Amino acid sequence: MAQGMKRLGMPVAVLLGVVLVGLTATSWLINRDALRQAVEAQIRAVTGLELTVKGPIDVSVFPGSYVSFHDVGLKGGAASDPALRVDVLTANLRLLPLLLQRFEIADLMMLRPQIHVARRADGESNWTPFIETIARTMKPGADNQVSFSEIRIQDGTLDYEDAGNHASEKLEDIDLSLAWPSISRSFAATGQFNWRGERVDGSISISDFVAALSGDRSGLKARLASAPLKLAFDGTVANRTSAMMEGTLTVDTASLRNALQWTGQAPPAGGGFGRFALKARANVVGASIALTNVNVELDGNVAEGVMTYSNNGRQTLQATLAADALDFTPYISTFRLLASGARDWNRQLFDLNSLLTTDLDMRLSAARVTVGPTKLGRTAFGANLRNGALALSVGEAQVYGGIAKGSFGVARSDAIADVKAQFQFLDVDLQACASELFGVNRLSGRGNLNVSLVASGSSPFGLASSLDGTATLTAHDGAISGFNVEQLLKRLERRPLSGGNIRSGSTPFDNLTVSLKFAEGVATTEEVRVEGPASRVTLTGTASVPTREYNLKGVASLTSNGATSFELPFVVEGPWDDPLIYPDPESLIRRSPATAPLLDAVKDKKARDAVRSVLERFTGGGVRPGAPDTAAPAPAPSPAAASEAAKSH
């Protein structure tokens, strides 16, 4: 056996020696100029680009068969600048044809290539000759068919300029492998590159490369994965008059806000825009994308429907979506009407830049909607944003136990927001409605509220200071907390100067009517009437929206069988959330048989101030200062009158 192996090994060794000697001889005898020219001709024939070599050329046949060109440029015939610069372009050769003095490229390797893509306004680019040539040479039966089927790129850069859209991009540190097997019509590219500071893994495969290069329909699969964003497409592509793609599109990101910033888009101001996922059937024509069978998730909100996006000079997004539940709390979490921990309006300036970036036309419907503390039932609304003007319309929303409908608009004028709101609340719970919308916690019952307001300002305080419009409220079967009008009036009817705390209890009402007119941030009462089982209240005066304070006067009346038996003027002053309510002291004094003569008797200022001080202790409230009186002093009150006043107390 060993002897047989020896006999077999000798011929093999001789054969290998002959091959080695032949290769060595070939490497010395081969015409290197002819080899270089053949390689240059093949590259020119395949790419359609002129090859210019400024550096040295290395030729090796054994042990490696290759030709390396240093400082290479490739450009179209009419182009002034090369479309491709390469530090080292290496063409690896096929061994067997080389032994027969035929020079065929097996693959190309580019070290540190600098790729320049310039797209003109007419859609053509400096790479159009390459695409046309390679499409022609890859067709079956072509005269100059592609001899190599793989290109590798190492440490490359790509500069892209789009004259039509005035855009430019740059890819760096490109490591890429492109392959189109000769036994197949397919094309594949896999690799990595850096874009805007992030490493991107990408792959693309085309089922019919020749058809795709010719603009005909071909299968396409593409994947891009990076830290900010993941994207995948599986479908078909064609490019006759414009690029067309149809297939399944999936997008996923942990933060849509970060992904938008990474791609050069300005995210909306405020909060939200975190976790985002989309899967849809996509139809792409040019710069427009139509999405059907959409399943989209944003910040935990899941919806279905259709969407379209276009970027013909200005970004436009249209959508019709339906959801089971929507939560808009994240998007208003950074918006504050009131200053933190204070009763004053927030003076922080609005950020209106997001109104200018995108046009929006969206229709949403949901079974449940949450906006901060507000819970809505079935709701249908639309949002339209065009040329910096935002319009929100609510077709119908179940809220506060009733129905709401109306519109809200914001238009930008430099740094000023012009706001217009028109809303109707029908048969709503007033306690929840007044508390959440206006910060008023003293009203309960059910009613209808109509609001029509306009304002302009650069902050919530600016809006409050310029508020104009009207508001009307009609309510029934409720109560106003803070004081009990009926009990107070009955007590004061018996003892006008009796003291005690009047800021307790609540006043029930059968009907409540409020009509207000706003002008420059001041609300003036046109009609305020409260009708209860045994009392009636009317109010006149103003309320300042910027300072959030009341300045009202009213009359409370006891009623019996429709007739008025006792009336008490009173005053409402102070902040909205904690107003001071007290009866008019002068009216109480006049109603008391014991002290009525005092008010008429006291004429000089010192005596009047002394009496008023005593009366304040009786009433528990303050006496509003009157105009100075210069009349002659009156005689002091009689001892009997003073004794009667003490008994009343």
Model-derived features: positions:
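Short extracytoplasmic
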Residues: 45-71
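Extended terminal
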Residues: 2-13, 281-287, 294-297, 301, ...
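N-terminal type II signal-anchor transmembrane helix
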Residues: 1-48
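Secondary-structure transition motifs
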Residues: 49, 66, 70-178, 195, ...
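Short beta-strand segments that buttress and anchor functional surface loops
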Residues: 70-74, 189-194, 220-226, 292-296, ...
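Amphipathic hydrophobic-ligand
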Residues: 50, 78-93, 122, 132, ...
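Glycine-rich, small/hydroxylated-residue low-complexity segments
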Residues: 105, 190, 244-248, 296, ...
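Elongated, acidic membrane-bridging lipid-handling scaffolds
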Residues: 113-114, 131-245, 346-381, 385
